[in-house]
Amino acid sequence: MPRFALTVIRHGETRLNKEKIIQGQGVDAPLSETGFRQAAAAGQFLSNVQFTHAFSSDLTRTKQTIHGILEKSRFCKDMAVKYDSRLRERMYGVAEGKPLSELRAMAKAAGEECPMFTPPGGETVEQVKMRGKDFFDFICQLILGKAGQRESVLPGAPGSGLESSLAEVFPVGKHGSLGANPKGGTLGLAASILVVSHGAYMRSLFGYFLSDLRCSLPGARDKLELSSITPNTGISVFIIDCEEARQPSIQCVCMNLQEHLNGVTEKQH
């Protein structure tokens, strides 16, 4: 039963984030100065973590963020990033480029809650969920060896260094457990995957983990936190056990971590 770690990070701040303008997929804004500092801070925080794979949305703000993170890495500075359109932000149609207040007004006029409302030309919540599920199924199959030969699937040399490097950054008791092997013994990670994506997309993905895969949460966390928007460069870590022809099991180690932002930017709520 292969086991892997999944670290999911939201992109750094853009000027439009600060101004509460909907970006979606059609407004491809770069990071602001604050956003670049956030990416560097996240990279410094994760600098001792060994990743075997790196994936990012193909939009500018996520590309700049993942490169800012990897630049600080002791082990992954030269790692190739795979850009995947399945990791893009939710498409908001006619609301893109407009203030969040206008989207809320559209939703109110339609008699719907804003997170569930689909603007004309936008993606439904279910469509975003299916994109997330498709990507997650892909990485599970990648780890199971179905995407090619084993030697090409795990380019980053899996081994005991993966779990020890994670445990240094996310110590047991502070951020929850890195997960005991259900069959006993060591954690035995086959891979450690870094993903950089977007706020609404990540909320949908985490909701899928909770509702469909029955993700277990660290002690003090609740379901509301899993369904909230991740702050810019907020870090969430999951441990996944995958097995052929069976639903993966998933454990949340930490959710929306932002302690690396102390002194970089005000915490976002």
Swiss-Prot record:
Disruption phenotype: Mice are viable and fertile and show no obvious developmental defects. Following intestine ablation by gamma irradiation, adult mice display a reduction in the size and number of proliferating intestinal crypts and an increase in cell death. Mice display reduced intestinal tumor progression compared to wild-type mice. The keyword Flavoprotein does not apply. It holds the Pfam family His_Phos_1. GO terms for molecular function: fructose-2,6-bisphosphate 2-phosphatase activity. It catalyses: beta-D-fructose 2,6-bisphosphate + H2O = beta-D-fructose 6-phosphate + phosphate. It is found in: Cytoplasm; Nucleus; Mitochondrion. The record marks H198 as: Transition state stabilizer. GO terms for biological process: cardiac muscle cell apoptotic process; cellular response to cobalt ion; cellular response to hypoxia; DNA damage response; fructose 2,6-bisphosphate metabolic process; glucose catabolic process to lactate via pyruvate; glycolytic process; intestinal epithelial cell development. GO terms for cellular component: cytoplasm; cytosol; mitochondrial outer membrane; mitochondrion; nucleus. Expressed in olfactory bulb, cerebellum, and cortex. Expressed in neurons and astrocytes (at protein level). Expressed in intestinal crypt. Fructose-bisphosphatase hydrolyzing fructose-2,6-bisphosphate as well as fructose-1,6-bisphosphate. Acts as a negative regulator of glycolysis by lowering intracellular levels of fructose-2,6-bisphosphate in a p53/TP53-dependent manner, resulting in the pentose phosphate pathway (PPP) activation and NADPH production. Contributes to the generation of reduced glutathione to cause a decrease in intracellular reactive oxygen species (ROS) content, correlating with its ability to protect cells from oxidative or metabolic stress-induced cell death. Interacts with HK2; the interaction increases hexokinase HK2 activity in a hypoxia- and HIF1A-dependent manner, resulting in the regulation of mitochondrial membrane potential, thus increasing NADPH production and decreasing intracellular ROS levels. This is Fructose-2,6-bisphosphatase TIGAR. The gene is Tigar.
